[in-house]
Amino acid sequence: MLIGGRAHAVAEAEFIAQAGFPFAEISIRTPQEFKREVASFRRLQDRFGIFYVAHGPEEVNTWEPEKLRADFLPLIRSLLDCAAELAITVFTLHFWLDRRFVADDIAAEKIEILKAMTGHADKCGIKLCIENLSEQVSDFPPVFAVIEGLGMTLDVGHGELLTARNTAYEFAAGWPERIWHVHLHDNRGGDTVEDDLHLPLGEGVIDFAAILGCLRKQGYDRTMTLEIATAALKSGKNIIEQTWQHEAPAA
């Protein structure tokens, strides 16, 4: 299991590399921005031996599949091509499918768009991973049933939103073979975008020992990104390592 940090800019990736983390999760938002930054990211790779996972741009036109197909799909294809230039093998995507807010007919069209994205990711040698935003575990079976190559990024902090019990427990138990990456940050519950606080670990209400125990019991042994401020990364890494080794039960 490898722990990395979230980098929204090259300077943050450099901080993460200098701090000794094995990887950074970088934002790839537009091909133009990527072309300006790719040389800097490569220098960090050469200097520190760091590797990258990627986070795509925010979804737009959530309820307009025709615009997603016309604009967002080609954008994601281009960004997957960019990611391949840095030998990135995991690409996280926001693509909201919470059936409490996205109608079934729109969700069905979005799943077809997601299938096309996943097909392009496969050609690039990249695992495309849909991230849980507010979705329940019941929202994902129709997706995974028709998109064999799609992975999941389990966001533990998001799991605390719009629910009485963190959904990470059910995701870890129900879809262990799909979970390719994990996001870690603390939250205090709530039901709005503003409630997604991305707090340092220990400043919210999430029971990380219990959730990490579920993941470890299912045999998870891939990457985890701390999606918190860079100043809190080292302490967050220590918390996760100690919890994983001493508190989370072994499989």
Stretch-by-stretch model annotation:
Residues 38-42, 68-77, 106-115, 164-173, ...:
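Charged helix-capping and loop-helix junction motifs
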Residues 60-66, 99-103, 162, 190-198:
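A short acidic, helix-capping loop that chelates divalent metal ions and anchors anionic groups
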Residues 1-80, 84, 151, 249-251:
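N-terminal pre-domain/capping segments
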Residues 22-23, 51, 89, 127, ...:
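Residue-level detector of anion-binding/catalytic polar loops
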Residues 64-151:
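Active-site acidic/histidine proton-transfer and metal-coordination neighborhood
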Residues 5-7, 26-30, 52-58, 93-95, ...:
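A cross-domain feature marking catalytic cores of carbohydrate-active enzymes
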Residues 1-2, 9-17, 87, 137-154, ...:
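Histidine-acidic metal/acid-base catalytic patches
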Residues 42-59, 111-121, 147, 208-213:
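Alpha-helix-loop-beta-strand connector modules within alpha/beta enzyme cores
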